[in-house]
């Protein structure tokens, strides 16, 4: 294995404008290493039904897939799956798929599938609830489209839709109201969705501005920045199932009381007290402005 890794690195180092085809040499070497780890062979892949059962036994695939499809359905998938499409990857593309999207134990580094198994299982999972007289044609068409790079899939779907922790939505909008129960409930929802691999959009425009009256003037509002810091901490304390760090975009209307402070929240100048740099921001403009 160490010799194989040296060969992969050597081929990758030779990739250049003058010798671009080394990207395929490095990709083939990396693919052979992956296949040896996953199936212990270079050419003879297991039947997709056996592969699925094995991954379910290891706890990395959702068992419901075997309840949704019969053995004859898996036989059709086996006829459609084309492992030679793995050779279409460049080195950079295959490396990204292995590092980010293949189901694996990120503690031990053990990988449980190859790219074509990944693509077929994604397709089968997405159409599992479709009418039985139509879904297999959808499975094939979608598999062909994604395995031949005709369409792209968002990270939450590509990385985990076939696992026990499903996440079909790549992005989730959390609408925050101007009450403490809503703000704290939204914070919990943000944390759970980030842990489920979703990107987050936060509509925080209804949170009132700094020094606004609360309970008839008994309390003055602390403003949006303390709550944004809370959201920032929640987003960054979780990763998207080990694939990448959480991310969120916060939306504010342009007429918000604190808009002048909001638009500089990512500015390098300023202190940690008045900056929230690890979130992204969007300013909403209505038709009154154009």
Which residues are covered by each model-predicted region?
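Extended catalytic cores of very large enzyme megasubunits
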Residues: 1-290
């Amino acid at each position: 294995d160490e010799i194989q890794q040296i060969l992969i690195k050597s081929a990758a180092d030779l990739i250049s404008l003058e010798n671009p085809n080394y990207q395929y040499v490095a990709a083939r070497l990396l693919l052979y290493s992956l296949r040896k780890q996953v199936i212990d062979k270079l050419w003879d892949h297991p039947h997709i039904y056996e592969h699925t059962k094995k991954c379910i036994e290891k706890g990395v695939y959702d068992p419901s897939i075997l309840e949704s499809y019969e053995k004859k359905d898996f036989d059709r998938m086996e006829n459609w799956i084309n492992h030679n499409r793995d050779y279409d990857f460049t080195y950079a593309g295959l490396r990204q798929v292995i590092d980010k999207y293949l189901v694996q134990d990120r503690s031990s580094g053990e990988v449980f599938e190859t790219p074509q198994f990944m693509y077929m299982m994604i397709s089968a999972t997405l159409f599992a609830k479709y009418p039985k007289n139509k879904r297999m044609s959808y499975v094939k068409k979608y598999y062909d489209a994604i395995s031949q790079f005709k369409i792209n899939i968002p990270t939450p779907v590509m990385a985990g839709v076939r696992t026990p922790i499903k996440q079909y939505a790549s992005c989730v909008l959390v609408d925050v109201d101007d009450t403490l129960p809503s703000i704290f409930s939204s914070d919990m929802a943000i944390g759970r969705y980030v842990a489920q691999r979703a990107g987050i959009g936060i509509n925080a425009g209804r949170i009132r501005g700094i020094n606004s009256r609360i309970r008839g003037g008994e309390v003055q509002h602390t403003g949006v920045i303390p709550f944004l810091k809370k959201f920032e901490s929640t987003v960054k304390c979780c990763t998207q199932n080990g694939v990448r760090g959480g991310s969120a975009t916060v939306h504010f209307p342009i007429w918000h009381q604190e808009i002048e402070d909001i638009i500089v929240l990512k500015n390098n100048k300023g202190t940690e007290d008045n900056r929230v740099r690890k979130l992204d921001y969007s300013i909403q403009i209505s038709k009154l402005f154009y």
